[in-house]
């Protein structure tokens, strides 16, 4: 015979609930009106419970005791004469303890219809505010709102420390129209570990990390972590206000690329990472002293495999645990801003790894990726490619970009592997790729996504820099979106990098035959807003360090590297240099070890470091080196054809009264005395910098700091002078004048 409590369940609903097959749990569990609103019933499912009472949250009084429906843990009961719903807790007696639990099934949906619309359409900039785990207060009750997108799952539960990882304890509410699942849990603590337990259509169960988690466990564990309530108090208003009005394409930008795990380490054997406080105390003063304007962080989103350097992230919203928590990262960025140093972040939106706890077949289907491997799999890295055609995927990525810029006050993003996003046949042979709707090779969905991304980010975050690592000749990468471009602010100049490093590796005897490798970049320098980048990719995987690439003895190696840096800092375009290159690291980069800081005990390495510092100082002081980077009138060759001597000479111009600077770069070990060079005006010229000075470890050949112009036309200039050009050296000359202003922010 059926008990009274059993009558409170629909036919078979209790059995379906126990078997994990009842997905519409909010219609069954919790408090509900019955008998046409004349009574209230409370139903709950609590494994191992012996007794359950209903307690009013308003006054703490017991309202009713629930009847046990069966031994599995189903309880139900009416609440006497009460007919109006109220907030309540369940006082649960277990064999070893008694707990008061605020029933999550008494709360309605917390999702906003406008948020849901924008998420589905691909235009949500703050999806992380309602997806993932967010602290909320509902009717004076504080708790965590969990929400996940899994439209093809049969059932989704949140499991964690707070429910002993029981997948039947907190089954989530399903929103059929948009594929979201949600639940509000009051009894959850900061730092609690959790996952989403999904039942696929084929009956398989899989525990997945939260795609929107803002904190994750240390590898090899992979649970998501409920965030802290307290957030970092920002003190960078002055920087943010200045940034908003800065035109970076006209400003000095000298970027120091850093992999936080290997810049420096601590511990007896260098086995411990620096935490963010260590980095605040050591990295920021170092970057400031060296004169860099920005730090570019290699990816800091959580990644399980150290060898990926962060370029295969699983927790796109979670700062990696390796160096501290989110507040620690915010404190580091805040300290950078207070030291007038910008912070850029490498951001990976081109692909994601196949780790089973991540996005791969998230709800049993190819939700974030393409079903067809000819579009969905990256052949080079065996990773998966985002389906940019799905609105929810676009919202996931757009919101993530906004998350880093808004919540962490980052000053821009450098998008990795953009070329692989733009082309459907990237690294694929014929027959291994699918053409677009027009029969072409361009990935139209990815192109539209990048255009939308840049347009939205520049509008929402004034003064940021969006940078593309794009290695092909795709037209319009930095062209505005309203003119058909992708809308990036800058593009890495991969052509200049490849040509110049190839030239650098040649014996000086043969450089005369490859002179165009250093001059060709000026043929296309104004086709995009280029950034000259010597990144981590150039000093790893057997490529050797920059110093190692250069032929000759040690003196020639160091002299050549100094001259190369001088040419780079004089060339139009913003600058980026990977850590360690500023003091001529001898070994190629190894992510498992600190940089070789002990090398700074030796004068040649100190000399390169001083040279970079002084180049940065000069770069920031003279507007001619940055203000017209992307306008042809800012650069003029004096002589680009002197291949016989491998000497390059040119002038950098600014605007109006800006002081012009003359660069003379000699890439052979031959000393040239009485070498005539054209000058942009008459009078005295200062030898502002000479890479061959003994201060930098050179042979001290030069012009004693001063050059006097003659009224003798030369190289298209009205004036000229006879100068000494040092071997493997770079001279930077300018009219004698007071030092101009700092052109950085």
UniProtKB/Swiss-Prot annotation:
Known catalytic reactions: Transfers a segment of a (1->4)-alpha-D-glucan chain to a primary hydroxy group in a similar glucan chain
UniProt KW keywords: Carbohydrate metabolism, Glycogen biosynthesis, Glycogen metabolism, Glycosyltransferase, Transferase
Enzyme class: transferase
Any GO BP: glycogen biosynthetic process
Pfam families per UniProt: Alpha-amylase (PF00128), Alpha-amylase_C (PF02806), CBM_48 (PF02922), GlgB_N (PF22019)
Annotated pathway: Glycan biosynthesis; glycogen biosynthesis
Catalytic residue positions: 416, 469
GO MF term set: 1,4-alpha-glucan branching enzyme activity; cation binding; hydrolase activity, hydrolyzing O-glycosyl compounds
Chain segments annotated as transmembrane: none
SS bond partners: none
GO cellular component, one term: cytosol
Top-level lineage group: Bacteria
Family annotation (InterPro entries): A-amylase/branching_C (IPR006048), Branching_enzy (IPR037439), GlgB (IPR006407), GlgB_N (IPR054169), GlgB_N_E_set_prok (IPR044143), Glyco_hydro_13_cat_dom (IPR006047), Glyco_hydro_13_N (IPR004193), Glyco_hydro_b (IPR013780)
EC number(s) given by UniProt: 2.4.1.18
HAMAP family hit by this protein: GlgB
Record's function text: Catalyzes the formation of the alpha-1,6-glucosidic linkages in glycogen by scission of a 1,4-alpha-linked oligosaccharide from growing alpha-1,4-glucan chains and the subsequent attachment of the oligosaccharide to the alpha-1,6 position.
Subunit structure: Monomer.
Protein family membership: Belongs to the glycosyl hydrolase 13 family. GlgB subfamily.
Protein name in the entry: 1,4-alpha-glucan branching enzyme GlgB
Organism encoding this protein: Shewanella sp. (strain MR-7)
Source taxonomy: Bacteria, Pseudomonadati, Pseudomonadota, Gammaproteobacteria, Alteromonadales
